[in-house]
UniProtKB/Swiss-Prot annotation:
Gene name of this polypeptide: mat2b
Cited Pfam families: RmlD_sub_bind
SUPFAM superfamilies the record matches: NAD(P)-binding Rossmann-fold domains
Pathway assignment: Amino-acid biosynthesis; S-adenosyl-L-methionine biosynthesis; S-adenosyl-L-methionine from L-methionine: step 1/1
UniProt keyword terms in alphabetical order: NADP, One-carbon metabolism
Function: Regulatory subunit of S-adenosylmethionine synthetase 2, an enzyme that catalyzes the formation of S-adenosylmethionine from methionine and ATP. Regulates MAT2A catalytic activity by changing its kinetic properties, increasing its affinity for L-methionine. Can bind NADP (in vitro).
Subunit annotation: Heterotrimer; composed of a catalytic mat2a homodimer that binds one regulatory mat2b chain. Heterohexamer; composed of a central, catalytic mat2a homotetramer flanked on either side by a regulatory mat2b chain. NADP binding increases the affinity for mat2a.
Organismal lineage: Eukaryota, Metazoa, Chordata, Craniata, Vertebrata
Organism: Xenopus laevis
An example Gene Ontology biological process: S-adenosylmethionine biosynthetic process
Any single Gene Ontology cellular-component annotation: methionine adenosyltransferase complex
InterPro entries with a match to the protein in the record: dTDP_dehydrorham_reduct, NAD(P)-bd_dom_sf, RmlD-like-bd
Name this polypeptide is given: Methionine adenosyltransferase 2 subunit beta
Binding-site residues for NADP(+), renumbered to this chain: T37, G38, L39, L40, Y60, S61, R62, N71, L72, C93, R97, Y159
Amino acid sequence: MEGRYKDYRIRFSPGWVEVVQDDVTVPSRRALITGATGLLGRAVYKEFKENSWHVLGCGYSRARPRFECLNLLDEAAVKALIQDFKPHVIIHCAAERRPDIVESQPELASLLNVVASENLAKVAAGVGAFLIYVSSDYVFDGTSPPYREDSIPHPLNLYGKTKLDGERAVLQNNEGAAVLRVPVMYGDVEKLSESAVTILFDKVQFSNKSANLDHCQQRFPTHVKDVATVCLQLTERKIQDPSIKGIYHWSGNEQMTKYEIACAMADAFNLPSSHLRPITDEPVGATPRPWNPQLDCSKLEKMGIGQRTPFRVGIRETLWPFLVDKRWRQTVFH
Protein backbone atom coordinates (compact mmCIF):
# COMPACT_ATOMS: atom_id res chain seq x y z
CA MET A 1 0.00 0.00 0.00
CA GLU A 2 1.38 3.36 -1.00
CA GLY A 3 0.38 7.02 -1.09
CA ARG A 4 1.47 9.95 -3.22
CA TYR A 5 2.30 13.53 -2.41
CA LYS A 6 3.82 16.51 -4.20
CA ASP A 7 7.45 17.43 -3.70
CA TYR A 8 9.24 20.46 -5.05
CA ARG A 9 12.84 20.89 -6.15
CA ILE A 10 14.77 23.71 -7.75
CA ARG A 11 16.56 23.14 -11.07
CA PHE A 12 19.39 25.51 -11.92
CA SER A 13 20.61 26.23 -15.48
CA PRO A 14 22.77 29.09 -16.81
CA GLY A 15 20.65 32.21 -16.76
CA TRP A 16 17.49 30.78 -15.23
CA VAL A 17 15.97 28.94 -12.28
CA GLU A 18 13.03 26.55 -12.51
CA VAL A 19 10.83 25.13 -9.74
CA VAL A 20 9.92 21.54 -10.62
CA GLN A 21 7.03 19.64 -9.05
CA ASP A 22 7.41 15.87 -8.70
CA ASP A 23 5.06 13.10 -7.65
CA VAL A 24 6.66 11.19 -4.78
CA THR A 25 5.47 7.75 -3.77
CA VAL A 26 5.60 6.88 -0.07
CA PRO A 27 4.42 3.73 1.68
CA SER A 28 1.10 4.18 3.49
CA ARG A 29 1.97 1.64 6.20
CA ARG A 30 3.58 3.64 8.98
CA ALA A 31 5.89 2.36 11.72
CA LEU A 32 7.25 4.33 14.68
CA ILE A 33 10.43 3.00 16.27
CA THR A 34 11.51 4.24 19.71
CA GLY A 35 15.16 3.87 20.60
CA ALA A 36 15.95 3.94 16.87
CA THR A 37 19.49 5.15 17.54
CA GLY A 38 20.28 2.07 19.66
CA LEU A 39 21.55 -1.34 18.60
CA LEU A 40 18.16 -3.03 18.27
CA GLY A 41 16.31 0.09 17.18
CA ARG A 42 18.62 0.62 14.20
CA ALA A 43 18.03 -2.95 13.05
CA VAL A 44 14.25 -2.65 13.42
CA TYR A 45 14.24 0.69 11.58
CA LYS A 46 16.22 -0.86 8.71
CA GLU A 47 14.04 -3.98 8.53
CA PHE A 48 10.78 -2.04 8.22
CA LYS A 49 12.33 0.48 5.81
CA GLU A 50 13.58 -2.28 3.52
CA ASN A 51 10.11 -3.85 3.49
CA SER A 52 8.29 -0.80 2.13
CA TRP A 53 7.11 0.77 5.36
CA HIS A 54 7.12 4.50 6.02
CA VAL A 55 9.29 4.54 9.13
CA LEU A 56 9.83 7.26 11.71
CA GLY A 57 12.67 6.61 14.13
CA CYS A 58 12.95 8.38 17.48
CA GLY A 59 16.01 8.89 19.62
CA TYR A 60 17.07 11.24 22.38
CA SER A 61 20.61 11.28 23.73
CA ARG A 62 21.97 10.01 20.40
CA ALA A 63 19.39 11.63 18.10
CA ARG A 64 20.63 12.26 14.56
CA PRO A 65 19.36 14.29 11.59
CA ARG A 66 17.31 11.45 10.08
CA PHE A 67 15.68 10.62 13.44
CA GLU A 68 13.14 12.53 15.50
CA CYS A 69 14.47 13.83 18.82
CA LEU A 70 11.89 12.73 21.37
CA ASN A 71 12.00 12.62 25.14
CA LEU A 72 9.79 9.66 26.01
CA LEU A 73 9.27 11.12 29.49
CA ASP A 74 7.52 14.14 27.94
CA GLU A 75 3.95 12.87 27.75
CA ALA A 76 2.67 15.81 25.71
CA ALA A 77 5.44 15.51 23.13
CA VAL A 78 4.90 11.75 22.79
CA LYS A 79 1.17 12.20 22.33
CA ALA A 80 1.60 14.99 19.79
CA LEU A 81 4.08 13.01 17.70
CA ILE A 82 1.96 9.86 17.63
CA GLN A 83 -1.26 11.70 16.86
CA ASP A 84 0.48 13.56 14.04
CA PHE A 85 2.27 10.55 12.49
CA LYS A 86 -0.61 8.10 13.08
CA PRO A 87 1.51 4.93 13.05
CA HIS A 88 0.00 1.53 12.37
CA VAL A 89 2.64 -0.03 14.63
CA ILE A 90 4.98 1.20 17.36
CA ILE A 91 8.04 -0.90 18.17
CA HIS A 92 9.19 0.19 21.62
CA CYS A 93 12.94 -0.55 21.72
CA ALA A 94 13.99 2.31 24.00
CA ALA A 95 15.05 1.20 27.48
CA GLU A 96 17.77 1.38 30.08
CA ARG A 97 19.14 -2.11 29.44
CA ARG A 98 22.31 -2.13 31.56
CA PRO A 99 21.61 -3.92 34.89
CA ASP A 100 24.44 -2.18 36.75
CA ILE A 101 23.24 1.27 35.63
CA VAL A 102 19.67 0.44 36.65
CA GLU A 103 20.90 -0.50 40.13
CA SER A 104 22.77 2.80 40.49
CA GLN A 105 20.03 5.00 38.94
CA PRO A 106 16.79 3.21 39.89
CA GLU A 107 14.42 6.17 39.66
CA LEU A 108 15.53 7.20 36.17
CA ALA A 109 15.47 3.58 34.97
CA SER A 110 11.95 3.11 36.31
CA LEU A 111 10.78 6.26 34.54
CA LEU A 112 12.07 5.04 31.18
CA ASN A 113 11.36 1.31 31.48
CA VAL A 114 7.97 1.57 33.19
CA VAL A 115 6.36 5.02 33.21
CA ALA A 116 7.27 5.93 29.62
CA SER A 117 6.11 2.49 28.44
CA GLU A 118 2.77 2.91 30.20
CA ASN A 119 2.21 6.30 28.59
CA LEU A 120 3.18 4.94 25.18
CA ALA A 121 0.70 2.09 25.60
CA LYS A 122 -2.13 4.51 26.39
CA VAL A 123 -1.42 6.77 23.43
CA ALA A 124 -1.01 3.80 21.07
CA ALA A 125 -4.38 2.45 22.17
CA GLY A 126 -5.91 5.86 21.56
CA VAL A 127 -4.87 5.94 17.90
CA GLY A 128 -5.37 2.22 17.29
CA ALA A 129 -1.69 1.44 16.77
CA PHE A 130 -0.28 -2.03 17.39
CA LEU A 131 2.39 -1.76 20.10
CA ILE A 132 5.27 -4.21 20.51
CA TYR A 133 7.11 -3.75 23.81
CA VAL A 134 10.56 -5.34 23.71
CA SER A 135 11.27 -6.99 27.05
CA SER A 136 13.95 -9.27 28.46
CA ASP A 137 14.71 -12.81 29.62
CA TYR A 138 15.80 -11.17 32.89
CA VAL A 139 12.19 -11.27 34.08
CA PHE A 140 13.06 -14.88 35.08
CA ASP A 141 15.45 -16.08 37.78
CA GLY A 142 17.07 -18.73 35.59
CA THR A 143 16.56 -21.68 37.95
CA SER A 144 13.99 -23.68 35.91
CA PRO A 145 14.58 -23.27 32.16
CA PRO A 146 13.28 -23.26 29.54
CA TYR A 147 10.67 -20.59 30.21
CA ARG A 148 7.39 -20.34 28.33
CA GLU A 149 5.32 -17.21 27.93
CA ASP A 150 3.05 -18.32 30.77
CA SER A 151 5.89 -19.23 33.17
CA ILE A 152 5.83 -17.27 36.42
CA PRO A 153 8.35 -14.40 36.32
CA HIS A 154 10.76 -13.90 39.19
CA PRO A 155 13.40 -11.25 38.40
CA LEU A 156 16.61 -11.30 40.42
CA ASN A 157 17.65 -7.71 39.84
CA LEU A 158 16.10 -4.28 39.46
CA TYR A 159 16.54 -4.27 35.69
CA GLY A 160 14.45 -7.42 35.37
CA LYS A 161 11.87 -5.96 37.74
CA THR A 162 11.53 -2.74 35.73
CA LYS A 163 11.11 -4.71 32.50
CA LEU A 164 8.46 -6.89 34.13
CA ASP A 165 6.68 -3.83 35.51
CA GLY A 166 6.89 -2.32 32.02
CA GLU A 167 5.26 -5.43 30.54
CA ARG A 168 2.41 -5.24 33.01
CA ALA A 169 1.90 -1.52 32.46
CA VAL A 170 1.73 -2.03 28.69
CA LEU A 171 -0.69 -4.96 28.76
CA GLN A 172 -2.94 -3.34 31.38
CA ASN A 173 -3.27 -0.14 29.37
CA ASN A 174 -3.38 -1.59 25.86
CA GLU A 175 -5.16 -4.93 25.55
CA GLY A 176 -4.12 -5.33 21.91
CA ALA A 177 -0.40 -4.86 22.57
CA ALA A 178 2.33 -7.49 22.38
CA VAL A 179 5.35 -8.12 24.57
CA LEU A 180 8.43 -9.66 22.94
CA ARG A 181 10.96 -11.08 25.40
CA VAL A 182 14.48 -11.49 24.05
CA PRO A 183 17.90 -12.38 25.55
CA VAL A 184 21.28 -10.66 25.22
CA MET A 185 21.73 -9.25 21.71
CA TYR A 186 24.54 -8.36 19.34
CA GLY A 187 24.76 -7.03 15.79
CA ASP A 188 26.11 -4.06 13.85
CA VAL A 189 27.51 -2.15 16.82
CA GLU A 190 28.94 1.35 16.54
CA LYS A 191 31.42 0.49 19.27
CA LEU A 192 32.23 -2.79 21.00
CA SER A 193 30.79 -1.62 24.33
CA GLU A 194 27.34 -1.24 22.75
CA SER A 195 26.62 -4.94 23.35
CA ALA A 196 27.38 -7.21 26.30
CA VAL A 197 28.48 -9.75 23.68
CA THR A 198 30.80 -7.69 21.48
CA ILE A 199 32.47 -5.98 24.44
CA LEU A 200 34.30 -9.28 25.00
CA PHE A 201 36.20 -8.99 21.71
CA ASP A 202 39.03 -6.84 23.05
CA LYS A 203 39.77 -9.54 25.63
CA VAL A 204 39.99 -12.00 22.76
CA GLN A 205 42.22 -9.89 20.52
CA PHE A 206 44.79 -8.83 23.10
CA SER A 207 46.22 -12.27 23.72
CA ASN A 208 49.34 -10.95 25.47
CA LYS A 209 47.26 -10.58 28.64
CA SER A 210 45.22 -13.31 30.35
CA ALA A 211 41.50 -12.64 30.72
CA ASN A 212 39.12 -14.13 33.29
CA LEU A 213 35.67 -14.85 31.88
CA ASP A 214 32.51 -16.18 33.51
CA HIS A 215 31.92 -19.85 32.72
CA CYS A 216 28.83 -20.27 34.90
CA GLN A 217 25.88 -18.19 33.70
CA GLN A 218 24.29 -19.45 30.48
CA ARG A 219 23.49 -17.04 27.66
CA PHE A 220 21.79 -17.28 24.27
CA PRO A 221 23.31 -14.51 22.10
CA THR A 222 20.78 -13.33 19.53
CA HIS A 223 21.36 -11.21 16.44
CA VAL A 224 19.35 -7.98 16.37
CA LYS A 225 18.43 -8.49 12.73
CA ASP A 226 16.66 -11.72 13.74
CA VAL A 227 14.69 -9.86 16.42
CA ALA A 228 13.89 -7.14 13.88
CA THR A 229 12.58 -9.78 11.48
CA VAL A 230 10.35 -11.20 14.21
CA CYS A 231 8.97 -7.70 14.92
CA LEU A 232 8.12 -7.24 11.24
CA GLN A 233 6.60 -10.71 10.88
CA LEU A 234 4.53 -10.27 14.04
CA THR A 235 3.30 -6.89 12.81
CA GLU A 236 2.31 -8.18 9.39
CA ARG A 237 0.54 -11.12 10.99
CA LYS A 238 -1.35 -8.68 13.25
CA ILE A 239 -2.65 -6.88 10.17
CA GLN A 240 -4.18 -10.17 9.01
CA ASP A 241 -5.18 -11.45 12.44
CA PRO A 242 -6.29 -8.96 15.13
CA SER A 243 -6.07 -11.70 17.79
CA ILE A 244 -2.27 -11.37 17.77
CA LYS A 245 -1.46 -9.93 21.20
CA GLY A 246 0.05 -10.84 24.55
CA ILE A 247 3.49 -12.26 25.34
CA TYR A 248 5.92 -13.89 22.90
CA HIS A 249 9.49 -15.21 23.18
CA TRP A 250 12.34 -15.13 20.68
CA SER A 251 15.95 -16.20 21.16
CA GLY A 252 19.01 -17.64 19.52
CA ASN A 253 19.34 -21.36 20.21
CA GLU A 254 23.08 -21.63 20.90
CA GLN A 255 23.76 -21.85 24.64
CA MET A 256 27.05 -20.29 25.79
CA THR A 257 28.79 -18.79 28.78
CA LYS A 258 30.82 -15.61 28.35
CA TYR A 259 33.93 -17.79 28.19
CA GLU A 260 32.41 -19.89 25.39
CA ILE A 261 31.29 -16.76 23.54
CA ALA A 262 34.85 -15.43 23.65
CA CYS A 263 36.25 -18.76 22.45
CA ALA A 264 33.76 -18.77 19.57
CA MET A 265 34.96 -15.29 18.60
CA ALA A 266 38.55 -16.47 18.62
CA ASP A 267 37.61 -19.48 16.51
CA ALA A 268 35.72 -17.31 14.01
CA PHE A 269 38.86 -15.28 13.32
CA ASN A 270 41.49 -18.00 13.87
CA LEU A 271 42.81 -16.12 16.90
CA PRO A 272 44.49 -17.73 19.93
CA SER A 273 42.30 -18.47 22.94
CA SER A 274 44.79 -19.96 25.41
CA HIS A 275 44.90 -16.66 27.33
CA LEU A 276 41.16 -16.88 28.08
CA ARG A 277 40.51 -18.36 31.52
CA PRO A 278 37.12 -19.87 32.49
CA ILE A 279 35.88 -18.81 35.93
CA THR A 280 33.21 -21.02 37.47
CA ASP A 281 32.85 -19.20 40.79
CA GLU A 282 29.84 -16.95 41.35
CA PRO A 283 30.79 -13.26 40.87
CA VAL A 284 31.25 -11.51 44.21
CA GLY A 285 29.54 -8.15 44.68
CA ALA A 286 28.10 -8.01 41.16
CA THR A 287 24.47 -7.31 40.30
CA PRO A 288 22.72 -10.73 40.50
CA ARG A 289 21.90 -12.27 37.13
CA PRO A 290 19.89 -15.39 36.23
CA TRP A 291 21.89 -18.60 35.77
CA ASN A 292 19.99 -19.88 32.74
CA PRO A 293 17.02 -17.81 31.52
CA GLN A 294 16.50 -19.86 28.34
CA LEU A 295 13.32 -18.86 26.51
CA ASP A 296 10.97 -21.41 24.95
CA CYS A 297 10.20 -19.99 21.49
CA SER A 298 7.83 -22.71 20.30
CA LYS A 299 4.82 -20.38 20.29
CA LEU A 300 6.26 -18.19 17.52
CA GLU A 301 7.86 -21.16 15.78
CA LYS A 302 4.46 -22.86 15.46
CA MET A 303 3.16 -19.65 13.88
CA GLY A 304 5.90 -19.82 11.26
CA ILE A 305 7.54 -16.72 12.67
CA GLY A 306 11.25 -16.43 13.35
CA GLN A 307 14.77 -16.32 11.96
CA ARG A 308 18.09 -17.41 13.48
CA THR A 309 21.57 -16.41 12.37
CA PRO A 310 24.27 -18.95 13.37
CA PHE A 311 26.43 -17.28 16.01
CA ARG A 312 29.77 -17.76 14.28
CA VAL A 313 28.34 -16.32 11.05
CA GLY A 314 26.74 -13.35 12.77
CA ILE A 315 29.66 -12.56 15.05
CA ARG A 316 32.14 -12.66 12.16
CA GLU A 317 30.05 -10.16 10.20
CA THR A 318 29.71 -7.99 13.28
CA LEU A 319 33.31 -7.92 14.50
CA TRP A 320 35.53 -7.86 11.45
CA PRO A 321 35.54 -4.01 11.25
CA PHE A 322 37.02 -4.00 14.78
CA LEU A 323 39.93 -6.32 14.04
CA VAL A 324 43.22 -4.90 15.24
CA ASP A 325 45.13 -6.96 12.66
CA LYS A 326 44.10 -5.08 9.50
CA ARG A 327 46.18 -7.38 7.29
CA TRP A 328 44.05 -10.34 8.31
CA ARG A 329 40.88 -8.37 7.63
CA GLN A 330 42.00 -7.38 4.13
CA THR A 331 43.10 -10.93 3.29
CA VAL A 332 39.86 -12.59 4.33
CA PHE A 333 37.19 -10.06 3.39
CA HIS A 334 38.58 -8.34 0.30
